[in-house]
Amino acid sequence: MTNVVVSGEQLQEAFREVAVMVDSTVAITAGPRGKTVGINKPYGAPEITKDGYKVMKGIKPEKPLHAAITSIFAQSCFQCNDKVGDGTTTCSILTSNMIMEALKSIAAGNDRVSIKNGMQKAKDAVLEGITSMSRTIPLEKMDEVAQVAIISANGDKDIGNSIADAVKKVGKEGVITVEESKGSKELEVELTTGMQFDRGYLSPYFITSNEKMIVEFDDPYLLITEKKLSIIQPLLPILEAVVKSGKPLLIIAEDIEGEALSTLVINKLRGGLKVTAVKAPGFGDRRKEMLEDIAALTGAKYVIKDELGIKMEDLTLEDLGTAKNVKVTKDNTTIVSGSSDSDRVKARVEQIKSQIETSTSDYDKEKLRERLAKLSGGVAVLKVGGVTEVEVKERRDRVEDALHATRAAIEEGIVPGGGVALLYASSALDKLKGGSDEEQIGINIIKKVLSAPIKRLVKNAGLESAVIIDHLTKQNDKELIYNVEAMNYANAFTAGVIDPAKVVRIAFETAISVASVLITTESMIVDVPNKEENASSSMGAGGMGGMNGF
C-alpha cells in the first residue's frame, strides 16, 4: 500500500460523485412507493431490500478515495439509526444534497468556511421550526402510536398495532424488548417480569452480535455483588460450574477491572465461557437497594457482600439468579422474565411504598418511584415468529426499527410526515440573514435542501413535485401533507402520515454535521495498492485486474 494525498478539484469531484451515488442509490427506497435495491453478497443470492440502512451498508466503491468518503457518509447515517432506529434514508438525502449544492458554490469561487458557517447558522432556526410543529402523544391515543410504528415498519399494520399494545401494557416509561419466537405465530405481545437499568457492558469484546453491537443471552445465570472485582482467583470455582452447566453468565458488580476483567474477556473470546459484565446501577445506599431489587427479581439467594461473610469461592449455582433473557448494550442492561420469588418481590414493593410515604425529600421520593416502577411495571416482550429463519430475522429487524421510532415519538412528539415537516421548517429561514454574502449562500443552501425529502418521495411515486410543493406552501396549513400512497392532499394527523419529531431532528442535525465536515475538507490521505500488489491481485483473480486510480 502507498499513501496518496488527494486535494483540490480532484477531491471535490470525488465528493460530488459519492454524493450523487448515495442520492441515486439510497434515496430511491424512500417512502411507501420507494423502489427496492439488490445488494450482492459474498455468498448466496443477492439481498433485495428497500431498507435505506441496509442499502447504505451495501455501498462499497472500488476506488479507495470514494470508499473512504462513502464510509464517512455511512457512519454518520448509522449514528442516526443508532440513536433513533430510523431516518437513515432522510439523512442520506439531506447530506448528499447539501454537499452537491455547496460544491457548486465553492466551484464558483465562494469561501467554503463561510458557507459552512451559514449552514450552521440556519441549523438552529430550522430546529426551532421542527419543535414548534411537534405535538405530544397522549397515552390514550394508541392509534397515533400505532401509526408511527406502521410507517417505520414499511406499512405493516400488525407490527404497529402490536407495539401500541405493548406501550399500553407497560406505559410510556415501560421497558419493551424484542425476541425471536420458536413458534410460527408471526407476532405476539407477552407481559412478563423484568427490569432495565442504565449500565452497559464493560468491554466491547463481550458483544455477541457485531451487527447490533449488543450482548444477548438466553437463560443466563446472574452473579450479583456489591464488591469490586479485580482478582480472578476467587471467581474460578463458580465460573467453572457455569461452564459445565453450558449456560451464559451476567456479572453485576460495583466494578470489574484488572486481571478479573481481562481474564473474563480472554475466556469469552476463546469460546470457553459465555459471559458479560456490567457495573451495578445507582450510587451509595441506592446502589445497594437496587442490587437487592435485582436479586429479588431474578431469584438470586442473596447479593454477595462483605457483611454476610460469604466468600466468592464458596458460591454454587443455586446461589445465583436466573433470567429468561438478558440484553446488554453499551448504555443499558435489560433483564427479562427473571425467575423471581413473587413473595420477595411483593415485600420489596410494599417496603418501597412505605418509604415513599415517610420520605420528606422530593428527590428521594422520585428515585423510590423509579425503583417501584422497575419492580412492578414488568417488561413487554414482542415475540417475533415466522416460517423460515430468514423471514424471522427480516421481520425482527423491522419490529426493532419500528420500536425505536415509536420511542422517539413518545419522547419528543410527532410532526406531519411525508417530508413536509422539513419543508415547512424552511420558512424559519425566510428572514434569517448571514453575516456576509457567502454566509447567506450557506443559509440559502439549507433552505433549498429542506425540500429534497418531499421531492424524492413524490418522484419515487412517479409524480411531479413542483406543483405539489407549490400547493402545500401556499395553503398556510402546516398540518397539510400530500399522501403519496393515496395520491391526495390530507391532514397529516387524520391520515396518519406522521413522523417522530426526534427522527426528523436527528436526521437533519446529522446531515448538516457531516456535510459541514466534508465541504471544508481540503485534502485526504488514502491508501492505494502499489503496482506489485495490483499485479499480484490481477494474477490471483484470473486476470480480472485490481483497483486502479483513486
Curated annotation (Swiss-Prot):
InterPro entries named among the record's database cross-references: Chaperonin_Cpn60_CS, Cpn60/GroEL, Cpn60/GroEL/TCP-1, GroEL-like_apical_dom_sf, GROEL-like_equatorial_sf, TCP-1-like_intermed_sf
Short name of any one Pfam family annotated for the protein: Cpn60_TCP1
MF GO annotations: ATP binding; ATP-dependent protein folding chaperone; isomerase activity; unfolded protein binding
Keyword hit for ATP-binding: yes
A GO BP annotation: protein refolding
Annotated EC: 5.6.1.7
Substrates-to-products reaction catalysed: ATP + H2O + a folded polypeptide = ADP + phosphate + an unfolded polypeptide
Chief location of this protein within or outside the cell: cytoplasm
Alphabetical list of PROSITE patterns matching this protein: CHAPERONINS_CPN60
GO cellular component: cytoplasm
Residues given in the record as ATP binding sites: T29, A30, G31, P32, K50, D86, G87, T88, T89, T90, G418, D499
UniProt enzyme class: isomerase
Cell compartment(s), UniProt: Cytoplasm
Sorted UniProt keywords: ATP-binding, Chaperone, Cytoplasm, Isomerase, Nucleotide-binding
Assigned protein family: Belongs to the chaperonin (HSP60) family.
Function: Together with its co-chaperonin GroES, plays an essential role in assisting protein folding. The GroEL-GroES system forms a nano-cage that allows encapsulation of the non-native substrate proteins and provides a physical environment optimized to promote and accelerate protein folding.
Subunit structure: Forms a cylinder of 14 subunits composed of two heptameric rings stacked back-to-back. Interacts with the co-chaperonin GroES.
Annotated NCBIfam families: GroEL (TIGR02348), PRK00013.1 (NF000592), PRK12849.1 (NF009487), PRK12850.1 (NF009488), PRK12851.1 (NF009489)
Name recorded for this polypeptide: Chaperonin GroEL
Organism lineage: Bacteria, Pseudomonadati, Pseudomonadota, Alphaproteobacteria, Rickettsiales
